Amino acid sequence: MATDALQLCVAETAYTHRETYPSRRDAYGPVLAGLIDNGRKVDATTLIELGYRRAAFTAKIHAMFGSGDLILMPAMNRAAPTLDELARQITNLDERLARMAFTAPFDLSGHPCLTLPGGATEAGV
């Protein structure tokens, strides 16, 4: 599920920035530029397949809400990443997927989420 959400996210990011990227690539930081570059590589057939899987998954989430009003779960399994960690995640797919394991399903389905802080690191993050 996280892989589907990630592929859709990068493709949608590339589409959103299509008028200014890559012509103004230098104005983008390395993290966002990397996401857009990855999004530009997602082909049309893959996007269609992802759309069908997204619709099927969204229907399952809708069905879950037929028997309950709320799903409680963690948002992240570790502290928020630093900018250096984010930059590393551009090339480390496993690290990216681990960070989004809990939120990706709802990014994919489009259901609303509320995230509440549950602590902080020594750096205050």
Predicted regions and their residues:
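Glycine-rich, small-residue loops and helix-cap segments
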Residues: 31, 42-125
